[in-house]
């Protein structure tokens, strides 16, 4: 179920403080965050976030197309190695 429009987008307070400080200082350093649940809002356009995926940090550059999504959607947490195949398929028959 989607979030109610009257509530507005959710952004963690510590992320919002860092965004406003980076915009005021015109700073291009990436903002390191573990807050995958924070929604991307228009104030974040042009900033780079290092989003934690459980193991490391994935750089996410925010553009206009990202507005309305969450930061965690752009930092995958799982790596797909492929389904197990037979030995003959790997050799090439």
UniProtKB/Swiss-Prot annotation:
Keyword set for this entry? Ribonucleoprotein, Ribosomal protein, RNA-binding, rRNA-binding
Tell me a GO biological process for this protein.
translation
List the PROSITE patterns. RIBOSOMAL_S19 (PS00323)
Pfam families found in the cross-reference section: Ribosomal_S19 (PF00203)
Q: Which residues form a coiled coil?
A: none
Q: Which GO terms fall under molecular function for this chain's record? A: rRNA binding; structural constituent of ribosome
Cellular component aspect of the GO annotation: cytoplasm; small ribosomal subunit
| UniProt xrefs under InterPro entries | Ribosomal_uS19, Ribosomal_uS19_bac-type, Ribosomal_uS19_CS, Ribosomal_uS19_SF
Q: Key word Transmembrane present in the record?
A: no
Q: Answer yes or no on keyword RNA-binding.
A: yes
What the record says about family reads: Belongs to the universal ribosomal protein uS19 family.
* Known function: Protein S19 forms a complex with S13 that binds strongly to the 16S ribosomal RNA.
HAMAP family xrefs: Ribosomal_uS19
Name of the molecule in the record: Small ribosomal subunit protein uS19
Q: What is the lineage of its organism?
A: Bacteria, Pseudomonadati, Campylobacterota, Epsilonproteobacteria, Campylobacterales
């Amino acid at each position: 179920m989607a979030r109610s429009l009257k509530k507005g987008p959710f952004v963690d307070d510590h992320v919002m403080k860092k965004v406003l400080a980076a915009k005021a200082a015109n700073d291009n350093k990436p903002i390191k965050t573990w807050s995958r649940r924070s929604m991307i809002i228009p104030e974040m356009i042009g900033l780079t976030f290092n989003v934690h995926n459980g193991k490391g940090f994935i750089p996410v550059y925010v553009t206009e197309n990202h507005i309305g999504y969450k930061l965690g959607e752009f930092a995958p947490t799982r790596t797909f190695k492929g389904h197990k195949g037979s030995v003959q398929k790997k050799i090439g028959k």
